[in-house]
Regions:
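Flexible mid-to-C-terminal extensions adjoining Fe-S/redox cofactors in radical SAM and related proteins
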Residues: 258-332
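A short, flexible beta-alpha/helix-coil linker loop
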Residues: 27-31, 119-121, 185-186, 297-300
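Radical SAM enzyme [4Fe-4S]-AdoMet core and its adjacent flexible, acidic
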Residues: 122-260
Length: 332
């Protein structure tokens, strides 16, 4: 058994100021009918238990996490759970400026990851609200000037592929690191003007999916060195490689390389369409503990109304799945 996972995602809210075509209605929260925001008092109870069970790195996501009215207090709460706690913030930059002083104060323990998918707001008939606007450029410059670890997350599809190389160059010039993610083909998307589900969603995802073969070759030729495995805080899920440009790097999350799966995944009815494997536990809106991206309801643990003892047992059930994982490919 390896070192137990110490990383958990927290989907604070399903609310978002944008509607990106590759996202789903509830964001990273797993339940398609549970919408809204975690109650702060209930969340604090669960986070305390999570920390006591060995989870010390908290990835805050949504929806858009900076929209919750207790965001400032949440940062302080997590930072005071213990001296070893860390926050990884997934955001589109909305309201982020309000919290820069606090983030700077804890900058040795907080990473900021801004979603930026294109140079222009409209690309090849697709709306990209998370583009490299002047506001985002200025925000990135301020984060770097304050010494805050900053990364752009870029979801690559056929729609924005023509802009990716220039976007990488501009990102490096700004001083931020980059993570490239291929599209996860799944059974639900907000879609390009129309929501798509089930078979229609799978077809939509396959149509706009862009492989990384040519892009990785380009990065290898442009970078000073490469690394086959490069992890910042969590080595589970899809293996990630890196390409270095001086002190900066471009990390590539490429699902064609397979993913780490638990033994419980072997007989799962969703395994043929699951490309993420077991990446991390996640707290979803609706007070649900599950595995990020997992569609199997056998591994959804409803925390609402449960005792502390029951919640601890659920965490242990989830965490045990990460004790024995194996790299496999489910793609054919």
């Amino acid at each position: 058994m390896g070192k137990r996972v110490n990383y958990i995602a927290v989907a604070l809210t399903t609310n978002c100021n944008y509607n990106c075509f590759y996202c789903k209605e509830t964001g990273e929260s797993i339940n398609s009918v549970s919408k809204g925001t975690w109650d702060f008092e209930e969340l604090k109870k669960v986070l305390k238990i999570a920390y006591e069970e060995g989870l010390s790195t908290f990835r805050l996501t949504g929806g858009e996490p900076t929209m919750v009215n207790y965001f400032q207090e949440l940062i302080e709460y997590i930072m005071h759970l213990g001296k070893d706690t860390k926050i990884r913030l997934n955001t589109n930059g909305y309201k982020l400026k309000k919290f820069l002083d606090t983030i700077e104060f804890y900058k040795n323990r907080i990473d900021v990851m801004i979603s930026v998918d294109s140079l222009n707001e409209y690309v090849n008939g697709f709306h990209y609200p998370k583009y490299l606007s002047r506001n985002i450029e200025e925000l990135a410059k301020e984060l770097i000037a304050r010494g805050i670890s900053t990364r752009f997350n870029i979801v690559v599809t056929k729609a924005n592929y023509s802009e990716i190389k220039e976007l990488i160059k501009k990102s490096i010039d700004l001083g931020v690191n980059v993570k490239l993610l291929d599209l996860i083909v799944r059974n639900e998307y907000l879609g390009n003007n129309t929501k798509v589900h089930d078979l229609d969603a799978l077809t939509f995802g396959e149509l706009i999916y862009q492989d990384f073969k040519e892009l990785k070759s380009y990065l290898a030729s442009e970078s000073s060195r490469t690394q086959d495995r490069h992890y910042v805080s969590n080595g589970n899920g899809i293996p990630m490689s890196a390409y270095f440009f001086g002190n900066q790097w471009v990390q590539v999350k490429d699902s064609s390389r397979g993913a780490t799966y638990a033994k419980e995944c072997t007989n799962c009815s969703y395994k043929s369409i699951c490309y993420e494997g077991v990446f991390s536990p996640i707290l979803s809106v609706g007070e649900i503990l599950n595995i990020s991206g997992c569609m199997n309801k056998d591994f959804y643990y409803i925390l609402k109304g449960k005792t502390e003892t029951e919640i601890r047992s659920y965490f242990n059930e989830i965490l045990k799945m990460f004790d024995h994982t194996e790299l496999k490919s489910m793609k054919h």
